C-alpha cells in the first residue's frame, strides 16, 4: 500500500476532536459540580445562562462557590495528566530521531480515544466527576497533546531544508491548530445543545479512531528505520540511554554560543507560553460568570473568534518574515497579546468580549517563530531532541501555568475577576526583557542561520 508524507490531516483530526471536547468538559464539570453540591440542575436559557447579578442573593453566592470549585477541579485534573505526559513526551519525541515519528502521533491518539470513551461512560451513567482523574492519568501515560505536537513539528521539520520554508510550515501547523480549534469550539455549543454531553464525547472518540487508522496504515514515516533496527529492537534501558544521550549531547557538544542561544530561546518560549496559556485558559470560566453569563453557544462563538487570531497570526508570520528578523516578529506578537488580555480584564459586555480579539490579532506569532528559531539552530539529527525539550517545556509550563492561574482566579473572582488577566499581561515583561537583551547583544537572528552550517562543515571535514 502506497503511503503519503502528509501529516496535516492527522493534526487536523486530532486538534478538532480535542478542541471539540475541551470547552464541553469544562461545562460538564461545572454542571456536575453544581448537581453534586446543590442536588439541582444548573439552569440555562437560549440566550444566556442562569447567572445571578444580585450580589446579595444566595444564588450569587452559590455561583461564585461553584466557580471556585470548578477552577480548583480543573487545576487538579491538569496536574493529574501532566506528570506522566511530561515523561512520555520527552522519551517518545526524542527517540523519534532514531525510532521514527509515527509513535509520537499514534500513542497520544490512542490515549485521547481512551479518555473520550471514559467521558462518554461518565456522562451516560452519571458517574461522579472523580472518575475523570483516571481518564486524564491514562491519557497522560500515552503522551497527550505535548507528545503529539512535538512529533508533528519534528515530522514537518524533517521535510524542510529551506529556513524560510521551515518557519512558514511550522506557522501553518499553528494556523491549523488555531483555525480547527476555533471551528471545533464553535460547533461544540451546537453539538452540546443538539446531542448532549454523551454523544459529543462519542463523536470525538470516533474521530480519534479514524486518526489512528490513517496514521497506522497510510502515513509514511520521515525517519528511515534500518532492517537491523527492526530485527534487533533496543531494550528499555538502551532506549532510555539513547534518549537522554541525544538531549545531553545537544547541549554538551554544542559551541557555547549555540548552547546559550538554545537556553535563552527556550526560556523566552517557556515564559511567554506561561503567561499566554494561563490567561487564555480562564476565558471560559470568565464568560460563564456575571456580567457576561454566556451559554454554551456563545462560548462556542468565543472559541471560534480565536480562529481569526490564528489566521491573522499566520498571515503576520508569512508577511513579516519577508521583511523582518524573527526576533522582531516575536516582539510584535507579545505586544499584541498584552493589548488583548488587558482589554479582556475590563470587558463587561458581550460585544466588548468579542472585540478583545482585535488587539490580539498577532498574539500567536511568537509560538511558531520561536519553534522555528530553535529548529534552525540545531542539526537535522537533533530535531527530535530539541522538539522533545519544547514538548516537555510545553507540558511543564502549561500545567504550572494552568494551576497557578486557576488558583489565582479562584482567590480573586469574588472581588475582581479580571485580575488574572492583568497579571498575565504584567508577566509578559519577562520575555520582553530577555528579548531586549538578546537584541542588544551581537546574537541576532542572522547568527542562528550561521551556526548550523559551521557545525555541518566541521562534521563533513571530520568524516572526510
UniProtKB/Swiss-Prot annotation:
* Listed Pfam families: MFS_1
Q: Record's InterPro entries?
A: MFS, MFS_trans_sf
Question: Would you name any one GO CC term?
Answer: lysosomal membrane
* An example Gene Ontology biological process: vacuolar transmembrane transport
As given in the record, the signal peptide range reads 1-26
Extracellular-facing ranges: 27-71, 126-130, 193-198, 281-296, 348-349, 406-418
The chain's Cytoplasmic topological domains, given as residue ranges, are 93-104, 152-171, 220-259, 318-326, 371-384, 440-464
Q: Which UniProt keywords apply?
A: Glycoprotein, Lysosome, Membrane, Signal, Symport, Transmembrane, Transmembrane helix, Transport
Molecular function via GO: symporter activity; transmembrane transporter activity
Q: Which residues cross the membrane?
A: 72-92, 105-125, 131-151, 172-192, 199-219, 260-280, 297-317, 327-347, 350-370, 385-405, 419-439
This protein is called what? Answer: Lysosomal proton-coupled steroid conjugate and bile acid symporter SLC46A3
